[in-house]
């Protein structure tokens, strides 16, 4: 029960961070780089590592860290989708190389865990439902 509660809190934190970052970038003209940094921090927290350190790794190494740390498959989907959304923000912030790395990291995670990434990273409609299903 404790593990399920922890997982639900983690998934809801991801959903909230993604939704808030999207809303702030869209509605409040927040710096897209700051939004990307926020998502990267949430990813690091989910794995128990500094986000900047984790995401400085190659895509294959990020997958290795997730596998070694035993990260829950539901969480890995949120991580991959957060990285994909982060790449959109980094593109807006004219950080092309870093945006490409985030896309590669997201795809590597998706490939390793059998995740279908959305065409539109900003479409969060199914994430809340997914988080609620994890709690069921």
Predicted regions and their residues:
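Short acidic, glycine/proline-enriched loop segments that cap or flank alpha-helices
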Residues: 70-75, 89-98, 116-118
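TPR/TPR-like alpha-solenoid repeats
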Residues: 82, 89, 127-134
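Hydrophobic/aromatic side-chain positions at a characteristic register within alpha-helices
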Residues: 6, 25-27, 84, 90-91, ...
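Boundary/linker segments of alpha-helical solenoid repeat arrays
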Residues: 47-52, 112-124
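The tetratricopeptide repeat
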Residues: 16, 75-78, 82, 119-127
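N-terminal alpha-helical interaction modules that lie
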Residues: 1-76, 130-136
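TPR/TPR-like (Sel1-like) alpha-helical repeat modules
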Residues: 32, 36-47, 97-115
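Structural register within alpha-helical repeat arrays
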Residues: 13-14, 20-21, 79, 86-89, ...
């Amino acid at each position: 029960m404790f593990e399920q509660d922890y997982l639900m809190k983690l998934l809801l934190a991801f959903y909230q961070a993604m939704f808030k970052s999207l809303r702030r970038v869209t509605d409040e003209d927040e710096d897209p780089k700051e939004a990307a940094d926020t998502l990267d921090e949430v990813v690091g927290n989910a794995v128990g590592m500094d986000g900047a350190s984790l995401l400085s790794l190659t895509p294959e190494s990020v997958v290795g860290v997730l596998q070694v740390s035993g990260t829950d498959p539901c969480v890995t989907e949120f991580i991959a989708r957060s990285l994909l959304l982060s790449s959109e923000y980094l593109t807006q912030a004219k950080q092309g190389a870093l945006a490409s790395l985030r896309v590669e990291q997201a795809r590597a995670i998706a490939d390793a865990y059998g995740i279908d990434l959305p065409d539109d990273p900003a479409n969060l409609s199914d994430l809340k439902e997914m988080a609620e299903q994890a709690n069921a």
